[in-house]
């Protein structure tokens, strides 16, 4: 819900994409870009509460197999996109450049943001202005440490924005990370890479990278990660949605690293299951118990939290309650892998308060 940069912009109109990005980006040791092939798409849920799409593919020589799950929840504050990555190395891999994920791709990165910051749920670790260079790294392989590590790309150069583009700051939050690279356990690392699209048109691409000193991936290596991509209006006046908490945050801190940190911290949920089993904390997924019921306590959160009740034998005969009040808007999907149904809804977060979410059976 962000107005584009143009005179007489209207609500609910079209705004250009605010970023671009890419999954596995690999240039081999000779600098040749290695395309992925055999992409297979599985549309498991179309929304409206939470989409769920999976992409499976492999590199052109079969060196790396990739699976990417992408979900976008309903929201009235700002865009969140949930990404689950799994890369499996099948053959030795060497590279001139390798990125497990890019925020802003080499040839799709429209917002002229001039500052980058990194941190975790406790706050800021470092902020800097990347060098304006062409096809070289500004800073390679910085370790991301702590819980809920994040990267913010902000400081938009307003004079460089094109008419009709949305002015946005962007962020990437690493919700979980597990990797073996070069036969050893590896933490996440971030690199900043400079590009130039025509004279003086510099952009910065943020990449999740291998650790420094690593030159080859071996068969059996893998990366498994849960990421959250977020986009915020870089101008508080451009936001026309109903979320007062976001509006207040933007009024104070728009186009800084603080909105990304706020999201990383505010949605680092630690729910407690009274019935059923929590299989994912955010977005929240609960498997029902043997009686097809679930009960979970959630404290805090920002925006609307996507909640999925999985393991249902039937799509009918269920009632979702939040603090005793029925939820009237949800979606029901068939899970072909488990051969069970699931119900998905979006629950308004309690910020600093505690809420009880219950799935009951109806007569």
Spans of features found by a protein language model:
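Surface-exposed beta-strand/loop patches in extracellular or lumenal glycoproteins
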Residues: 96-106, 295-316
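Acidic-aromatic substrate-binding/catalytic surfaces of carbohydrate-active enzymes
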Residues: 1-62, 67-69
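Acidic, contiguous internal or C-terminal segments within carbohydrate-active enzymes
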Residues: 42-114
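Beta-strand-rich recognition/accessory modules
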Residues: 140-279, 286-287, 334-362
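Short beta-strand elements of extracellular/lumenal beta-sandwich folds
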Residues: 82-88, 290-300
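Polysaccharide-binding surfaces and accessory modules of carbohydrate-active proteins
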Residues: 90-180
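Solvent-exposed beta-hairpin/edge-strand motifs
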Residues: 105-121, 309-326
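Solvent-exposed beta-strand/loop surfaces of large extracellular or lumenal domains
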Residues: 321-341
